[in-house]
Amino acid sequence: MAASWSLLVTLRPLAQSPLRGRCVGCGAWAAALAPLATAPGKPFWKAYTVQTSESMTPTATSETYLKALAVCHGPLDHYDFLIKAHELKDDEHQRRVIQCLQKLHEDLKGYNIEAEGLFSKLFSRSKPPRGLYVYGDVGTGKTMVMDMFYAYVEMKRKKRVHFHGFMLDVHKRIHRLKQSLPKRKPGFMAKSYDPIAPIAEEISEEACLLCFDEFQVTDIADAMILKQLFENLFKNGVVVVATSNRPPEDLYKNGLQRANFVPFIAVLKEYCNTVQLDSGIDYRKRELPAAGKLYYLTSEADVEAVMDKLFDELAQKQNDLTRPRILKVQGRELRLNKACGTVADCTFEELCERPLGASDYLELSKNFDTIFLRNIPQFTLANRTQGRRFITLIDNFYDLKVRIICSASTPISSLFLHQHHDSELEQSRILMDDLGLSQDSAEGLSMFTGEEEIFAFQRTISRLTEMQTEQYWNEGDRTKK
């Protein structure tokens, strides 16, 4: 797999009221147990993730969690273990999804895609089980339950990846394949070539199970190839599990040329059951001990001096000198003005005003466990490009448990302002002219309403809030790994 994939390392080998709900398709019924008593002084919930890159050690979170991996036999067993240990609060909505994942876990036992080629696939008796598409609001535990499921899947050929990173990898593969084709001879028409099927075949040989976090479609280039790509993956026997903030019907809502995207929804539903996880609680915003002050307002007195002092204190613990650093990212150089060991001191301009992307932020996450990010502005539709980069940056930092110390112009809750200004309206008018769109036809498009950004901003605010907690800070300490 390409290095841009952010993979989950499986840790397991190392180490109420009678509410009922039914998963659409798999038929698994959930009967919620009475909530277990919570010990005094114990938090109801501890969010965690075991996602990391292949080259890094797993971000183990708690001794109880590791014990669960050693003694439990599936995601449902694991969930009950953590509840009894008062690491989690029993949530009937999560339990319903866990039961669906438990059923899929059992269905996957012994399943594998034959790697010998088309002939063996045609005569294989192993029919792939239906995957699962889990959707719901931010912070409800979608990523957590998928990570529990993933940790117990025993097949070797499995991948756990952020959906945005996966699509970046697909486009790179397409580009690489096209570059390898024979050049067109002068005077001859170039032969049309469809790279999607061979790319899907390539991915299928690498993974029988694909687990996607944050399944969302905002890019027209992605939208136009998804149906063909996933149709080929599914026909090759790949099983998909995905989490998303949106139901399948709302994917790429109001996007350009959405009519060409809609058939993908039917393909997704044909091969995946859908289940909603929506308890109405954002567990990332629960009351947990803060890790000191990690988020400053630029209007505060001496904020630069305070952050300088914090950097110096962390730098003293590093076996390195404070100096500029250059990281290599896919043949390019990513220059940082100030770093020391695994601590980097950056400005928003350095990381989000420049044309950087997920691969750059992933490389940062691999090299640094603590990053200072200064002078974050308030985001509106006028600076949506920088806002999207910031969202991608936080997603990568959060996935790899990078600790951040920030200064920003507004509190976290006010970082994203959904309001149109005159300059934004003028930019929209220019873009509408370039695309040949009328006012009426453009009114509902998400690229003009900012609808997709609003969904992503909600996730980012939720994650930034959790990143201020003592628990998150301790989990990001790589010196303990």
UniProtKB/Swiss-Prot annotation:
Pfam families according to UniProt: AFG1_ATPase
EC number(s) given by UniProt: 3.6.-.-
InterPro entries: ATPase_AFG1-like, P-loop_NTPase
Signal peptide positions on this chain: none
Record localization: Mitochondrion membrane
Top-level taxon in the UniProt lineage: Eukaryota
Molecular functions per Gene Ontology: ATP binding; ATP hydrolysis activity
Keyword Membrane: yes
Chief localization: mitochondrion
GO biological process, one term: mitochondrial protein catabolic process
Residue sites binding ATP per the record: G136, D137, V138, G139, T140, G141, K142, T143, L209, L210, C211, F212, D213, E214
The keyword Translocase is assigned to this record: no
Keywords: ATP-binding, Hydrolase, Membrane, Mitochondrion, Nucleotide-binding
Role according to the record: Putative mitochondrial ATPase. Plays a role in mitochondrial morphology and mitochondrial protein metabolism. Promotes degradation of excess nuclear-encoded complex IV subunits (COX4I1, COX5A and COX6A1) and normal activity of complexes III and IV of the respiratory chain. Mediates mitochondrial translocation of TP53 and its transcription-independent apoptosis in response to genotoxic stress.
Self-association state and partner proteins as the record states: Found in several complexes of 140-500 kDa. Interacts with YME1L1. Interacts with COX4I1. Interacts with COX5A. Interacts with TP53; mediates mitochondrial translocation of TP53 in response to genotoxic stress such as mitomycin C treatment.
Entry similarity comment: Belongs to the AFG1 ATPase family.
Name of the protein in its database record: AFG1-like ATPase
Gene expressing this chain: AFG1L
